[in-house]
Curated annotation (Swiss-Prot):
Pathway recorded for this protein: Cofactor biosynthesis; pyrroloquinoline quinone biosynthesis
Gene name per UniProt: pqqB
Protein name: Coenzyme PQQ synthesis protein B
Keyword Transport listed: yes
Organism domain of life: Bacteria
PANTHER family: COENZYME PQQ SYNTHESIS PROTEIN B (PTHR42663:SF7), HYDROLASE C777.06C-RELATED-RELATED (PTHR42663)
Parts of the chain that traverse the membrane: none
Lineage: Bacteria, Pseudomonadati, Pseudomonadota, Gammaproteobacteria, Pseudomonadales
Family: Belongs to the PqqB family.
Keyword set includes Transport: yes
Length: 303
């Protein structure tokens, strides 16, 4: 299985265009040793030619431009994208669909709840129906697994996550199974397994079992502290309220990941306020000391 990190930041990217927190300002004035990041998205393939896009970031055009296999140039109009899987209906995971309209129709896999949001509150399916067939919906059931024709050796097993629907959603404060998903993806030829959960607010026993079954854990790295947005003066909500488990402290993501010695462990969906973006920070050193990597745009993983 080929895993390509197209974007590794949370919503807004890093540096965020309108933010002057210590990280964003430090990056711009050159006092912070850090790497710019676009908004979270990955691509998966079983042959390095046909790709499944997981979430469509607002930065999708730049992300595709930076990854040569996404333009194989086999025809006058071409793309390496053969299907799209949406893990939720968040704006920073779906807006990129608008920039992919020239390539319609697209095969899009998502749950009933995500499809409901994307046909009502943020009606991308309706809007894009005018472009050569638009978005062709393939329902993700919450039980069992599915296979996408373009990558027949990849088996996708979805699992619901406890997190919130987008602010625009009619059921923002009435969560339903299927609002947010993670994926366990297995390459049935190599046996390699990826656990992918960029928005992970709580880890229960069932998820721990799935994580132990995986070879690579690509998980939520949004915040260092649960109250980080408040500490940085850029927001009022905690990580838990937003559906993100912070890295630091008892029960935090790093403590969870300490329980895995065999797996490759990688943080993704990193918010611009997170001190681990500062490559010279003690927080970054602590992450690395505990055997955890920090995803970056262009990162490649093979399983």
């Amino acid at each position: 299985m080929y895993i390509q990190v197209l974007g590794s930041a949370a919503g807004g990217g890093f540096p965020q265009w309108n933010c002057n927190c210590v990280n964003c300002k430090g990056y711009r004035d050159g006092t912070l040793r850090a790497t710019a990041r676009t908004q979270s998205s990955i691509a998966l393939s079983d042959d390095g030619v046909h790709w499944v896009l997981c979430n469509a970031s607002p930065d999708i055009r730049a992300q595709l431009q930076a990854f040569a296999p996404m333009q194989p140039a086999r025809a006058l109009r071409d793309t390496g994208i053969n299907a799209i899987v949406l893990l939720d209906s968040q704006i920073d995971h779906t807006t990129g669909l608008l920039s992919l309209r020239e390539g319609c129709p697209h095969q899009v896999w998502c749950t009933d709840m995500v499809h409901q949001d994307l046909t009502t509150g943020f009606p991308l399916f309706n809007m894009l129906s005018h472009w050569n067939g638009g978005l062709q919906w393939n329902r993700i059931e919450l039980e069992g697994s599915f296979v996408i024709e373009a990558c027949p050796n990849l088996k996708f097993t979805p699992f619901p996550l406890r997190s919130a629907a987008p602010p625009y959603s009619p059921h923002r404060f009435d969560p339903h199974p299927g609002d947010n998903l993670g994926l366990l993806v297995e390459d049935t030829r190599t046996g390699g397994k990826l656990f992918y959960a960029p928005g992970l607010g709580q880890v229960d026993g069932k998820l721990l079992a799935m994580m132990h079954d995986a070879d690579c854990l690509l998980v939520d790295g949004t915040l260092w502290e649960d109250d980080e947005m408040q500490r940085r003066g850029v927001g009022t909500r905690t990580g838990r309220e937003m559906g993100h488990l912070a890295q630091n402290g008892p029960g935090g993501m790093l403590e969870v990941l300490d329980g895995f010695s065999r797996q490759r462990k990688v943080l993704i969906h990193i918010n611009n306020t997170n001190p681990i973006l500062d490559e010279d920070s003690p927080e970054r050193a602590e992450v690395l000391r505990r055997g955890v990597e920090v995803a970056f745009d262009g990162m490649s993983i093979e399983l």
